[in-house]
Each structure stands twice: as C-alpha cells, then as structure tokens.
C-alpha cells in the first residue's frame, strides 16, 4: 500500500503544480475566460469518455501495466503542455492528459485487489490522503516556481512531468502484482433504471452532480477572478490554494469522521452546503487579498463536509446488490459536473459578469439545501 500511496502523491503533486498556472497560461496565449475554463472541461470530458476503456483494459492485462501506462502518459502530457506554443497545442495536451488519466480508477481497483474488506477503507483513505497532501504542496510549489515579476510557465510543467515520472518509477519498482482480481468490466449504466426508481438514491446522485457542477465552476474561474479583481498572479493564487487544501484536509481527515456518527450524514451535508453557499456569497465581495482567506476557508471546509458524507450516504442507501453500480454512477455524475460546471462558469464570467459564476453557484445551492433538508426528515423516518 505504501507504493501506491507514494506514486499517487507524486502524481497528484504534479497535477496540483499546474492548477494555479493553467488559466494564466491560457490567457498568455490569447484565450478568453471561456476558453481558459474550457481547458478544465475538455480534460474531464476526455477522462470521462475513456475511463470505461481503462477499466476493461486493466481487467485484461492487469492493474500494474495500466497504472504504468497512465503515469507515463501523464508525464508526456505535461511535457507537451510545457512545449505548447499556441492555444490549440494547450488544448490537445490537456485532452491527451485526460485520456491518459486512468490511473486513479485503476489504483482504486488495485487497492480492492490487494486488501480485504477491513483493509479496503484504509487503502482508499491513503489514496484520499495522497490527494489532500498533493493539493497542498502542489499549488504552493507551482506558485513558487512560476515566479512573480516574469512568469515562468515551463519550469512548473516540467516539474509536474517529473512528478509523474517519479510515480512511474515507484510503481515499476515497488508495486507488486495482485494475487486476486476483482473485475471492473461490468458497466454501471445497467443499474441506472433501478437507481431512478429509488427516489432517495436518485436524489442523492443529482445532489452529487449539482455540488460538483458548482464547485468545479468555482475552481476553474477562481484564478481568473483573482487576476481580474485582486491583480494576483499564479504565485499568490498557488499559495492561497494551498491554504484552501489545508482546510479541506483538516475537515476530511478528522472532523467528518467525528461529526457523522453524532449528526448523521444528511445533517453534515446540510451544514457543508451552508458553509459552501456562504463562501460563494462572500467571495465576490472581497476587495483585498487577505480577506480571500475567509471565503476559501468556507468553501473548502464546506466541500470537505459534503463530499465524503454524500459518498457515504449514497453507499449506505443503495441496496447491497447495486452498491457498486450506484457508486459508479455517482462518479459519472461527478465527472459530468466537472465537465459542465467550468463551461458554464467560463461563459458566465465572460458574458454576464465576473461575479456570476459564484452568484449562480449560490442560486443552484439553494434548492440543493432545501432538498437536503427534506432528505434529513425522510432518512430519519426511514430509520
């Protein structure tokens, strides 16, 4: 398990390195706000379309080869991005990186292969910890490497490629072949009619989509808003994103596990949505950099409450026979939110107003909060 944790950490740090830089890189090459945020959408779309293919391939040739191919492809994608000289090359590099981003689902399948039921939660938690730490150190490192007066775009991207190369090396040397094999090949879409006919479960998945639609839209326009309103470059955006990552890790790493047994997932979800909504309202009102810490803390604390609690509630609400399918469809809803959210946010930023990605996100959260409050009562009555 240590090998998969170290490999994931190295790769996620690389991803985190380019996140604060990517919108500025697109603007540098003549993109408008919509084109800049669409870079997030095309990455997620490519990942969404190819994820089932990676699953079937890993069933056929094994988890380790697919993980190695994916990490190698990620390194090439970052190199391609570093060498990009126009917006078209940037788009092609991000699409290629999305296609090659099959390592996460395959790593989760690897954990399922090498652990028993008791150890699986710990293994998945280690992958989650790798993501949390990666999105603390990655943005801070990317911001630092980018510089302040003259922005160095290539160096952070080369470091990101190095992170994926380290992940490839660690996996090649330390990752052992699983003794057993849990198939990923069955399509989760066959469970969709059953999920639609289960109102509470279907509603939870719609909420999951809505949350990621709002949050991905906010993430994709944050740097653009900081550049436009607060005159911030990628260095400071990277530092602020690292702070946000710390807030998220504190919540998901400790607070959620303590609050859910006392309050239940549904109430924790409502609380998280209220935090998130407050952050979206406060963010466009900020006029000085230091005050940006407040809405970022609210947003990432809120998301830290909602995301694991919704996952847990979906898993617990689904019948055992369709639990895997329900979680698969929930992940598809997550991906669709990450595709459509940045596209809408970029359009709103460019065509309606720079604050509208956040105001519209708040408007979307209002019915989500109301539905969540109704679910609290329904779940309590069901018990």
What are these regions (language model features)?
Residues 20-33, 220-236:
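Short amphipathic helix-loop junctions that connect adjacent transmembrane helices
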Residues 51-61, 251-265:
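Helix-to-loop junctions at the C-terminal end of transmembrane segments
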Residues 65-80, 267-282:
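Structural signature of the two symmetry-related core transmembrane helices
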Residues 93-132:
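Cytoplasmic helix-loop-helix junction between adjacent transmembrane helices
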Residues 162-180, 371-376:
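C-terminal membrane-cytosol helix-exit motif in multi-pass small-molecule transporters
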Residues 176-207:
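Juxtamembrane intracellular "pre-TM" segments in multi-pass secondary transporters
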């Amino acid at each position: 398990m240590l090998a998969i944790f170290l490999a994931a950490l190295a790769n996620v740090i690389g991803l985190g390195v380019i996140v604060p830089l990517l919108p500025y890189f697109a603007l540098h090459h003549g993109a408008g706000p919509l084109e800049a945020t669409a870079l997030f959408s095309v990455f997620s779309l490519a990942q969404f379309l190819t994820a089932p293919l990676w699953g079937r391939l890993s069933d056929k040739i094994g988890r380790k080869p697919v993980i190695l191919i994916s990490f190698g492809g990620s390194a090439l994608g970052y190199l391609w991005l570093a060498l990009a000289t126009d917006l078209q090359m940037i788009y092609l590099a991000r699409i290629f990186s999305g296609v090659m981003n099959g390592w996460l689902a395959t790593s989760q399948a690897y954990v399922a292969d090498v652990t028993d039921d008791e150890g699986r939660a710990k293994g998945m938690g280690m992958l989650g910890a790798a993501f949390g730490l990666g999105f603390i150190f990655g943005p801070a490192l990317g911001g630092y490497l980018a510089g302040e007066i003259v922005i160095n775009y290539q160096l952070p991207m080369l470091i990101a490629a190095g992170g994926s190369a380290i992940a490839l090396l660690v996996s090649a040397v330390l990752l052992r072949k699983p003794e057993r094999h849990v198939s990923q090949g069955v399509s989760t879409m066959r469970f969709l009619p059953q999920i639609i006919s289960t109102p509470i479960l279907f509603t939870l998945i719609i909420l999951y989509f809505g949350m990621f639609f709002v949050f991905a839209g906010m993430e994709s326009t944050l740097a653009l808003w900081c550049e436009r309103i607060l005159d911030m470059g990628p260095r400071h955006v990277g530092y602020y994103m690292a702070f946000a990552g710390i807030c998220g890790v504190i919540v998901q790493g400790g607070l959620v596990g303590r609050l859910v047994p006392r309050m239940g997932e549904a109430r924790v979800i409502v609380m998280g949505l209220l935090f998130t909504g407050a952050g979206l309202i406060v963010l466009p009102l900020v006029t000085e950099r230091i005050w940006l810490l407040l809405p970022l803390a609210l947003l990432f604390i809120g998301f830290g409450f909602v995301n694991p609690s919704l996952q847990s509630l979906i898993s617990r609400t689904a019948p055992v026979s369709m639990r895997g399918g329900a979680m698969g469809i929930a992940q598809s809803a997550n991906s669709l939110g990450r595709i459509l959210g940045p596209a809408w946010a970029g359009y709103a930023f460019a065509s309606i107003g720079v604050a509208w990605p956040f105001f519209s996100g708040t408007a979307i959260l209002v019915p989500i909060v109301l539905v969540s409050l109704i679910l609290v009562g329904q779940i309590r009555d069901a018990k």
